[in-house]
């Protein structure tokens, strides 16, 4: 490799790092779990990110796409992604087996303000694929449990078969140091023993919160936000302590292509985590 090539390799932000798929399996019919490690072990262990950030994954000959990190930085070395089959890149990823090679660059975005959240009550509200980015911050809170006050999770899915990381969430219910409430819109199995209804029906089950001492993290389908925010405001949680992770047409990850721009806001740089206060002033965000 000549000097110019070495220079470009180190300075070009679009150059992905080679990575290997360590483990992959179906979470649901159209959602797969991917555990990935950078080939360079030194870089793998040094890969630093915050919960809520994302990375670009690429498949040779197909292209690349942004995916939120579902792992936690408190467990270095391996990166985890929860991916739904929805397009060209995801279809190519779904065909790959364990030990297959992919490209990875990142991390990108702002992530959750975990330093500000320390010592606070944490209420996580998620629906459907909203689990993917919020799993990162949930695992981070569990790995650093003594640094946070109350932790509560409200998770809703359409059907039991569509509940992502189902076993993980049921295991959370066995823990004595957090709340975990689960719901499905409808039970087509006849064996579902948890709540039936949309995720907002879980709010009455939530133990009393101290609004000024609470951060709420929200992610789910667009239709969910309006109703969840309404419930959080009823609890008097401050608008700047309601955090929403929004992935809006992100393409390059570094604020160059303009695909995710809303006026002066770039989702890939200024987000994907926004406060409800931000959203009120940028209504196109949701």
Where do the protein language model's features map onto the residues?
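Ferredoxin-reductase
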Residues: 3-100, 158-159
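Beta-strand residues in well-ordered beta-sheet regions across diverse protein folds
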Residues: 35-37, 82, 105, 125, ...
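FNR/FR-type flavoprotein reductase catalytic core
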Residues: 88-251
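Local cysteine-cluster metal-coordination motifs and their immediate loop/turn environment
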Residues: 223, 247-272
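Short Fe-S-cluster ligation motifs
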Residues: 258, 263, 274-286
């Amino acid at each position: 490799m000549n000097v110019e090539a070495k220079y470009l390799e180190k300075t070009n932000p679009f150059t992905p790092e080679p990575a290997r798929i360590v483990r992959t399996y179906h979470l649901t019919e159209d959602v797969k779990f991917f555990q990935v490690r950078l080939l360079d072990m030194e870089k793998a262990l040094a890969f630093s990110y915050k919960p809520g950030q994302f990375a670009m994954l690429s498949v040779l000959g197909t292209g690349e796409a942004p995916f939120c990190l579902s792992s936690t930085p408190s467990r270095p070395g391996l990166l985890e992604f929860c991916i739904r089959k929805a397009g060209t890149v995801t279809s190519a990823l779904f065909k790959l087996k364990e030990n297959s090679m992919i490209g990875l660059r990142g991390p990108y975005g702002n992530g959750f303000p975990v330093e500000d959240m320390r010592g606070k009550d944490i209420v996580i509200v998620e629906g459907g694929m909203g689990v993917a980015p919020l799993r990162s911050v949930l695992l981070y809170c569990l790995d650093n449990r003594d640094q946070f006050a109350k932790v509560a999770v409200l998770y809703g899915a359409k059907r039991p078969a569509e509940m992502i990381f189902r076993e993980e969430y049921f295991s959370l219910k066995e823990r004595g140091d957090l709340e975990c409430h689960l719901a499905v819109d409808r039970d087509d199995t006849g064996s579902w023993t948890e709540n039936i209804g949309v995720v907002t029906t879980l709010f009455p089950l939530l133990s009393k919160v101290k609004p000024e001492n609470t951060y709420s993290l929200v992610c789910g389908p667009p239709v969910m936000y309006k109703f969840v925010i309404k419930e959080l405001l009823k609890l008097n949680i401050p608008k700047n302590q309601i955090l929403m992770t929004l992935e809006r047409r992100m393409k390059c990850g570094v604020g160059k292509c303009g695909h995710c721009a809303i006026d002066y806001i770039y989702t890939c740089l200024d987000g994907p985590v926004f406060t409800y206060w931000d959203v009120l002033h940028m209504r196109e965000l949701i």
